[in-house]
Regions:
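Structural marker of alpha-solenoid helical repeat scaffolds
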Residues: 110, 144, 185, 220, ...
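TPR alpha-solenoid repeat register
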Residues: 117, 151, 192, 227, ...
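N-terminal propeptides/low-complexity segments immediately following signal peptides
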Residues: 27-66
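Canonical tetratricopeptide repeat
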Residues: 86, 120, 154, 195, ...
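Alpha-helical segment of the N-proximal tetratricopeptide repeat
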Residues: 77-110, 123-127, 164-168, 198, ...
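Residue-level recognition of tetratricopeptide repeat
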Residues: 80, 114, 148, 189, ...
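Structural signature of tandem alpha-helical TPR/SEL1-like repeats
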Residues: 95-102, 106, 127-140, 163-181, ...
């Protein structure tokens, strides 16, 4: 059975916590489904289905016929909802996210518990890596439409996107629970089985159950490249590398679209096979030159190899394509920091701060953020600029004694 169309394999930028040392860069990729946002396979959920309208004859409203009037009104509202769903879907496909959001939000004003509208909102937030908003929207969709497997799987995907700070353990456990519900509802759904494997990996479980979930996915759909890549990853982690390599090769052979290629590249990077990810990402960008995940992963790989000038155009374009995503701005700022372009680093970090979670804000205050910018200004003997950067760092991380000392030294 082919993988259901719950998700067209694709991308959206992953939320990766990249530990980079500019003196000797060491990118620490975490497990699939953890830092790689389900490296997983981040999929692009399909659009909510807009029902085909039927040409209903307008009922004749007679005096005193309140029920007929109500029926006509309800029918008009339902037609309006279908129109808005269709518009939202079209805007999303065109990456006109603000207009898509407005369309889906308009549905909720007409029908407050519309699972399809909530699911549509989750999709566009996920496309833009607005993970907290995506989670809230998908949770509404799962609550209002509890048997909607699309919503359950999409929610499981978003929940494995790691966020700096507390709460990841509960989200990963929830991701597993929602994936299990999806498998129970549709036991022959290959993608749901794959997502169950990803959720288990997010919890650090590289065991027989995780392997079984992925093997079930490839049994149900032998043409499912993402599941092959995930199975290869778990076998690698279980020390069965000879079994893993042919599966990576099979995944690459089957991959025909940018999304699937991104998943393979993410998995290779998570295994520290940075160099092997480059040709895969080049294939992706040949197919879709503005694919935000591929742009980010290419920039990330180049930074790992200290090829900062080469990484800049990829990361800049990633910020243009996904202007509300934290990680591309954050890594672009680090790139400028490595190039000693402190003014540009400062501006870029400021833009990242607008989308940063509480945990991310503390990260931005640190050595690979405004503190690093301040240090750079100090070395360049630009004390007023250094003081400004340290002050901004303190605003992001109040009470940090080291930052207070650095600020005092800059005055």
């Amino acid at each position: 059975m082919r993988a259901p169309s719950i998700f067209r394999s694709v991308l959206t930028l992953t939320s990766l916590s990249v530990g980079l040392s500019f003196a000797g860069v060491c990118a620490q990729a975490q497990d699939i489904g953890v830092d790689v946002g389900g490296a997983a396979g981040i999929f692009r959920p399909k659009n909510p289905e807009a029902k085909k309208r039927t040409n209903r004859p307008s009922p004749v409203v007679r005096r005193g016929s309140a029920s007929r009037t109500t029926g006509a009104t309800n029918a008009a509202v339902e037609d309006r909802i279908e129109d808005l769903l269709d518009k939202g879907n079209q805007f999303r496909d065109a990456r006109r996210f603000a207009e898509a959001e407005a369309a889906y939000q308009s549905i909720l004003k007409l029908k407050a518990n519309s699972g399809r509208a909530a699911y549509g909102l989750g999709n566009i937030y996920s496309d833009q890596q607005r993970w907290e908003e995506a989670e809230a929207a998908y949770r509404n969709a799962a609550q209002w439409s509890p048997s909607d497997v699309d919503a359950l799987v999409a929610l499981s995907v978003v929940l494995v996107q790691p966020r700096t700070g507390a709460g990841n353990a509960k989200r990963f456990a929830d991701a597993e629970a929602f994936a299990r519900r999806a498998v129970q509802l549709e036991p022959k759904n290959a993608i749901a089985w794959d997502r169950l494997g990803v959720a288990l990996q997010a919890r650090g479980l590289f065991n027989n159950e995780t392997e079984h979930a992925y093997r079930r996915a490839v049994e149900l759909d032998p043409q499912f490249p993402v599941a092959y890549a995930h199975l290869a990853r778990v076998l690698n982690r279980m020390g069965r590398r000879d079994e893993a390599q042919p599966l990576y090769e099979r995944a690459t052979q089957l991959a025909k679209d940018p999304a699937t290629l991104n998943v393979i590249a993410e998995s290779l990077q998570a295994e520290q096979q940075w160099q092997n990810s480059e040709p895969v990402l080049k294939r992706t960008l040949e197919l879709d030159g503005k694919n935000p995940t591929a742009l980010y992963l290419m920039g990330r790989m180049l930074v790992v190899f200290k090829r900062y000038r080469e990484s800049e155009p990829y990361l800049k374009l990633a910020t243009e394509v996904s202007p509300r995503a934290f990680q591309p701005f954050n890594l672009l700022g680090r790139t400028y920091l490595a190039l000693n372009r402190f003014e540009e680093a400062e501006v870029t970090y400021e833009r990242a701060a607008a989308f940063a979670s509480p945990g991310d804000r503390k990260q931005l205050a640190g050595i690979y953020g405004f503190e690093g910018v301040g240090d750079g200004y100090m070395k360049a003997k630009k004390k007023p600029s250094a003081a400004r950067a340290y002050q901004r760092a303190l605003e992001l991380d109040p009470g940090n004694k080291e930052l207070e000392q650095r600020l005092a030294g800059a005055h």
